[in-house]
Amino acid sequence: MTAFPSLFVSHRSPTLSVEDCAASRYLQWLGPQIRDTLGTPEAIVMISAHHDGAGRFGVTTTAAPTTIHDFGGFPEALYRIQYRPPGAPELARSLAEGLRRRGFDMFEDELRGLDHGAWVPLRLMFPDADIPVIQLSMDMRASPDRHHALGNALAELQAAGVLVIGSGSATHNLREFFTGGFRLDSPAPDWVRGFADWLAERIEAEDDDSVLRAVETGPQGQRNHPSLDHILPLFAAMGAGGEGAEGLRVHTSYTYGVLAMDVFGFGDPPSSKGCPIPRARSAPPPMKVYANARLVPRTPRTASPPLRVSLPCGECEGGQGHSERRRLSSG
């Protein structure tokens, strides 16, 4: 079974799903590229900036997630958009059980659908909505390290054919956005570009400690992230790459000046070599190539118990699924 990378995507606002820009074109390219090079994921676990468990981590267990229009003041057409992939309740409950064994206080939500932090990038990447989706909440009261540990507990899902995606924003200062008079194509100020480039450099240097303290110690960190909600999914995605996985910024662009639309891959993201982003109104920015990244061993952390993952199996009677224990190799 294919081992998928974990990804972090910047989702901006619901208008990304209908506006033509380098970031939307990249996500439209990325989904098919994943299918072509790695295969179709068995399921997707989304960690969105707009799902806060308010003191706990949680997982959606609905079989048919609805589309949540959790925004106001946008064009009416956005409220008519429906993105309705199937859920994966058995996998979600198995995931919750495994995370509890790892010390996470988990709740299960049978009613919640997909907020725009989930469905906006998924609709661009996988428009057919044919891959089961689970949404995992953040806990805004928990530390960056705790979210990184949550992601690390999800690392085995890669080897089970599950794609883990954190969805937030590489930079996210809405006060500057609303008061700065920025347009869609406004150039990024130095304080935005400087932080985004520093963040990418630290990720590619595998400097996890600096990344986890980015808001505190990065250049203009607190100005770029007045709150942690849109960077916490990055920490989870970074952890989900697994021990020793390389991280790389696979896309960079800016919209409305202050919003860096970076996409990061952790593990072995697909290569863009020989497969350019489809052209639209303007040429996309250059992309780095990430092909068959070597997993560089790091100093191992304290071993955790294996996460039991239950996936549907066509060989099981009644399609009930079975459990598998998997570990990622760091070599």
Where in the sequence are the language-model features?
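Surface-exposed, charge/polar-rich loops and edge strands
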Residues: 97, 101, 142, 156-163, ...
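Low-complexity, intrinsically disordered or signal/transmembrane-proximal segments
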Residues: 290, 320-322
